[in-house]
Regions:
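Non-catalytic pre-domain segments flanking phosphatase-related domains
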Residues: 1-29
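N-terminal basic/disordered segments at the start of proteins
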Residues: 26-53
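Helical "lid/coupling" subdomains associated with nucleotide-phosphate turnover
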Residues: 30, 44-47, 63, 67-96, ...
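A secondary-structure boundary/capping signal
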Residues: 36, 105-106
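Conserved beta-strand/loop subsegment of P-loop NTPase cores
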Residues: 99-103
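Acidic donor-binding segment of Leloir-type glycosyltransferases
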Residues: 121
Length: 402
């Protein structure tokens, strides 16, 4: 049952709610570990919902890829931190009662001479099997993560890690061409020749990528911690009032102005204002040089930040196609109504009641009205004097994908 069949209940073109589908209920908590070049993270999704609910989400900055360009090996200190983090994550997963953990490692472990030794050590000490994925697979999973949040997305996905940067084309819900490069800021920090040497490497690498992919005039989707740090600083520079990272939009001009803003300010002061860790802030000046190069070579018309990446792409792998095709906004609002409203199901009746007031609206506008109807009663517990404010906070700051 995928929710598309006819029943006595008319669900409209958004179909039966996913939480009413037995197959969806069978997808219990999903645990994913991402062993990156800069950080190690555990995410536990509370079921493979169309709009993911994060039951647990923790990151440890390990810098496994620090010095990789010079030594060819993983950072010894990074290995110690990563092993400690993985032991802890495995203990947490056991305490939560996860049936299984999916663990992937990316560029640093993939390219290091001692990468396979590290994978073996993790298996011996924790029982966790790490799957080392290649650059093409890394790009595919990141692109799938973007599709989890934007089912109809089109454009170029750019995922930056510590030791690599991946590009993937997306269109009509499908992942197209995929490319990988060595443009991770942790790796670039070790390039000889200082800033000029880095600029030369960045320019030459991007020229090669553009030759393979061609100009990308659609949207550029940014995935990765360094991109999110740049977006946080851009928010701070613009005094942007809504500090929600997912779907935050920027223009090429914004990036240029934020680059100058970073150069003109003390980095320690800036990172505190923007809420960026010191380890991440050290990489931001390099990452923004890469981003400016991407804009020059590919010329996208606008930029959107995606909080969804590899980990969400792995969640996407668990989903049947019928679930992938659903609208994440409507599904998350339906779930919120079922969990928090006094009369679950009334939102759909309310939507039908007011529909004649909007005879000529677009599909995009209709889905927003539908979502508002579903959320109309989820804040009933708030004090009546502040209920309007609480409703606003819920709608603007809740974890509503799409």
């Amino acid at each position: 049952m995928d929710g598309s069949e006819k029943t006595s209940q008319d669900w409209g073109h958004f179909h039966r709610p996913l939480f009413a589908d037995p197959k969806s209920r069978d997808l219990s908590r999903v645990g994913v570990i991402d062993v990156g070049s800069n950080s190690v993270r555990l995410v536990v999704f509370d079921g493979a919902a169309r709009s993911p609910a994060y039951f647990f989400n923790e990151k440890v900055m390990c810098a496994l890829g620090a010095g990789l360009a010079d030594t060819g090996n993983l950072s010894p200190e990074g290995r110690i931190r990563a092993l400690a983090a993985l032991r802890r994550f495995c203990t947490i997963a056991k305490d939560i009662g996860l049936p299984d953990l999916t663990a992937v490692a990316t560029a640093a472990v993939r390219e290091a001479k001692d990468g396979s030794d590290f994978v073996g050590q993790v298996l011996a000490e924790t029982g966790l099997k790490i799957h080392v994925i290649d650059g093409s697979e890394e790009a595919r999973l990141s692109a799938q993560g973007v599709l989890l949040g934007w089912p109809g997305a089109y454009g170029l996905v750019c995922d930056i890690g510590g030791a690599s940067m991946e590009l993937a084309e997306i269109s009509n819900g499908q992942v197209g061409k995929r490319m990988t490069s060595q443009l991770g800021p942790l790796r670039l920090a070790s390039i000889k020749g200082g800033k000029q040497g880095r600029k030369k490497v960045i320019s030459e690498s991007l020229e090669g990528l553009r030759a393979q992919l061609g100009q990308q005039s659609d949207r550029l989707f940014l995935v990765g911690g360094s991109w999110r740090a740049i977006a946080r600083i851009d928010m701070q520079r613009r005094d942007y009032p809504l500090h929600v990272m997912h779907e935050y939009r920027m223009t090429p001009r914004d990036i240029r102005e934020t680059s100058e803003y970073i150069k003109a300010n003390n980095q320690d002061h800036l990172r505190k204002l923007a809420g960026v860790s010191s380890a991440r802030m050290d990489l931001v000046p390099i990452a923004i040089d890469v981003l400016k190069g991407i804009l020059r070579h590919f010329k996208p018309h606008d930029i959107a930040v995606s909080s969804y990446g590899i980990r969400e792409g792995l969640l996407y792998e668990h989903m049947p196609q019928a679930m992938r095709d659903r609208d994440p906004l409507i599904e998350s609002c339906r779930f919120a109504e079922r969990k928090d409203a006094r009369l679950p199901g009334f939102g759909m009746r309310l939507h039908k009641f007011i529909a004649p007031l909007f005879p000529k609206i677009t599909v995009d506008r209709e889905r927003l009205i539908h979502a508002a109807c579903l959320l109309h009663d989820v804040s009933w517990r708030a004090h009546s004097d502040f209920r309007g404010e609480v409703c606003f906070e819920y709608a603007t700051r809740a974890n509503l994908g799409g």
